[in-house]
Amino acid sequence: MAEEFVQQRLANNKVTIFVKYTCPFCRNALDILNKFSFKRGAYEIVDIKEFKPENELRDYFEQITGGKTVPRIFFGKTSIGGYSDLLEIDNMDALGDILSSIGVLRTC
């Protein structure tokens, strides 16, 4: 069930972030991503509270990404990791270029 839940969301979006809104790292990751203007349907925020039991979902994250924690951030079906990974990409001023290269940003 966890695999289906995750894979359905990854199939429909180019940038997907799995969060828990009470998590400060999740809020920080959302702040970084929300600096950008995404095309409609190219960005999805998934609250992991939507899935029960949560530990099954976290176990699946560990299986496919090596980490159980949130946020779990995907560009397409590729995991870029969590908040610290996103922050590192952003601090290198590479995030905008990456998002542009995968075609998820508005051009206007």
UniProtKB/Swiss-Prot annotation:
Query: Where does it localize?
Result: Virion
This protein's GO CC annotations: virion component
Q: Which GO terms describe its molecular function?
A: glutathione disulfide oxidoreductase activity
Induction statement: Expressed in the intermediate phase of the viral replicative cycle.
Q: Name one Pfam family in it.
A: Glutaredoxin
Record SUPFAM superfamilies: Thioredoxin-like
Which Gene3D superfamilies does the UniProt entry name for this protein? Glutaredoxin
Q: Which gene encodes it?
A: OPG075
Q: What does this protein do?
A: Has thioltransferase and dehydroascorbate reductase activities.
Q: Which NCBIfam families match?
A: GRX_euk
Per the UniProt entry, what species is this protein from, by scientific name? Answer: Ectromelia virus (strain Moscow) (ECTV)
Q: What is this protein called?
A: Glutaredoxin-1
